[in-house]
Design a protein with these regions (language model features):
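A conserved ligand/cofactor-binding region detector
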Residues: 1-545
Length: 545
């Protein structure tokens, strides 16, 4: 089911000192400085390479990482199983004093999760209290093959069945179309946006590639393979694995077992409960039981979905701005909450506006976020967007977000660039074939497995319930120039609805880094800044060497 990356004997000898295995898609990072782990994961998200190959090619033999010196000391140590036994003994003593949950919050692990479908990545990234870096579709062309096939998963439910050949053939055709159109988009953008003299070649080419990848990504199916780097505490991993055990997808359940195996090399005692029948297994059964009951209840709803806009503001507090003023004054007043609310209601509008401006302050950039008083204000948005945009917005975890199953039922988006290169016919044909494949899979294996066939261009319904402080972060970040045009449009509309539908003019206007402008080469400025940072880093390194 998984491609095994080839390494030489010498490479495996190096890798075995820093990773818990050299031949499986899930592995933990060991014996590395924390800064190296972070840098490795950061590079990982923009590279087509596996983490182990990236480590060998770009990190291992660089003296500034200190990796080679660590490798020499590790080579002389006792075997890993003995070190784990010693750690277990220590953890047992600590647990007896402080309890499992308290200690499990303080120990963590870096885990690489490779060859994950884009259904699995959403399950991995569900938990709030963890850090994730996922391979981006905007910096990598998915037109290369591993071991003779494109980078997609044939789910265990389908592999070896009579539908497997049809499934694989349709996937190959879809990726053939993607490969053709992503290169055609790149050539089109090169003609449309020729390199200007003041822009370096690498910056221009990176911007062109990002725009082409953005335009063509709608053809990538949910079965597309990705890599995810995770850093989480033992407690967060436990919650993740227990939730994954309850999944209806065999890929997710198989991955759970692989993750548990690797994590037990590095934080074994934190994960003792996961596969114990009376503890983690019972917990997983609770999740699956509730899901089964709700599926049954949901199937009896007779209503058909109404026609709605791409973004709807469905709930907000009409008194939000008054409550915000009361909360802003709470920490500096010495007055009880209800008394402050009464005072805020009596304030003239001009005075409330003055207090709010003082509380927001003079923001020099979007990272200067105002305080927690904004967390008293909330907004609930119902969104019907392409799955590709959902993948980006779903990464925001300081809010409540739930989604429905991915299906072809809500139609799909056609990017302007596809029309411009005269490829709309191929786009429609490819997506139509995948809708037919979805129906076959749905009939044979049910709607959960059928999701693998649905490309990113198809629309998915989800809600996002957030407080105003998180709205500052999300809307200002996701409308910035370098963002994908589709999710920029969604977040621009959220901002407009806060101001115009909710009538929260003061709050919306305080989000002064929300960008409603439109751009051509969205990544150009960001790539310029990246190049400048690389140059400064190289100069600093040359001065110290």
């Amino acid at each position: 089911m998984y491609f095994t990356e080839p390494f030489s004997d010498a490479e495996r000898a190096v890798l075995s000192r820093f990773f818990t295995n050299t031949d499986r898609p899930v592995f933990a990072l060991i014996n590395m400085p924390e800064v190296v782990k972070g840098a490795l994961f950061a590079r990982y998200s923009r590279s087509p390479k596996s983490l182990r190959r990236l480590f060998l090619d770009e990190f291992y033999d660089r003296p500034e990482t200190g990796i080679e010196a660590i490798a020499e000391s590790v080579a002389g140590e006792d075997n890993p199983s003995l070190r784990i036994q010693r750690a277990e003994s220590l953890y047992e003593r600590v647990f007896s004093e402080y309890g499992d949950d308290s200690v499990a919050q303080l120990g963590g692990a870096h885990l690489a999760c490779e060859q994950s479908s884009n259904l699995l990545t959403k399950v991995l990234e569900w938990g709030r209290l963890a850090a994730y870096l996922e391979q981006s579709t905007r910096y990598i062309y998915y037109d290369q093959k591993d071991d003779g096939r494109y980078r997609y998963l044939t789910p265990p439910e389908i592999a070896g069945t009579t539908l497997a050949a049809d499934y694989n053939a349709e996937m190959e055709m879809l990726f053939d179309t993607y490969s053709k159109l992503v290169r055609a988009c790149a050539a089109h953008f090169e003609r449309k946006y020729p390199k200007e003299p003041e822009v370096s070649g690498p910056v221009w080419r990176s911007s062109i590639r990002a725009k082409a990848c953005d335009a063509a990504r709608g053809l990538l199916p949910a079965a597309t393979l990705s890599n995810v780097g995770i850093f989480a505490t033992g407690q967060a991993y436990e919650a993740m694995l227990i939730r994954m055990q309850a999944s209806p997808l065999e890929e997710v359940r198989q991955y759970t077992r692989m993750m548990l195996q690797e994590l037990r090399y590095v934080i074994p005692a934190f994960l003792r409960r996961v596969d114990i029948e009376a503890r983690g297994i019972a917990w997983s059964k609770y999740f699956s039981g509730v899901q089964s009951q709700m599926e049954d209840t949901g199937s009896r709803l007779a209503a058909q979905p109404a026609e709605v806009a791409e973004v709807s503001l469905t709930e907000w507090d009409p008194d939000a701005e008054v409550k915000l003023i009361a909360s802003a004054l709470y920490a500096v007043s010495g007055l009880p909450d209800d008394q402050l609310l009464a005072l805020a209601k009596k304030m003239p509008a001009a005075e409330r506006e003055k207090v709010l401006k003082q509380y927001v302050g003079d923001r020099k950039n979007r990272r200067h976020r105002p305080g927690r008083a904004f967390e008293r204000v909330f907004y609930r948005f119902d969104v019907l967007s392409d799955f590709g945009s959902f993948r980006d917005l779903q990464r925001h975890r300081m809010l409540t977000l739930e989604w429905q199953r991915l299906t072809p039922d809500h139609g799909y988006n056609v990017p302007d660039a596809i029309e411009e290169i005269g490829a709309s016919g191929e786009w429609h044909a490819a997506l139509g074939r995948m809708a037919e494949l979805y129906q076959k899979l749905n009939s044979a294996y049910g709607p959960d497995v059928a999701q693998y066939a649905v490309p990113f261009a198809y629309r998915l319904r989800y809600y996002m319930h957030m407080n105003a402080r998180e709205a500052f972060h999300l809307l200002e970040l996701r409308t910035s120039r370098q963002g994908h045009a589709d999710y920029r449009r969604i977040c621009q509309e959220m901002h407009r609805l806060i101001r115009e539908k909710a009538g929260h003019r003061l709050i919306a206007d305080a989000m002064n880094y929300v960008d409603h402008n439109e751009y051509d080469l969205e990544r150009l400025d960001a790539e310029r800044r990246s190049e400048e940072r690389r140059h400064r880093g190289a100069q600093a390194q040359s001065r110290t060497s």
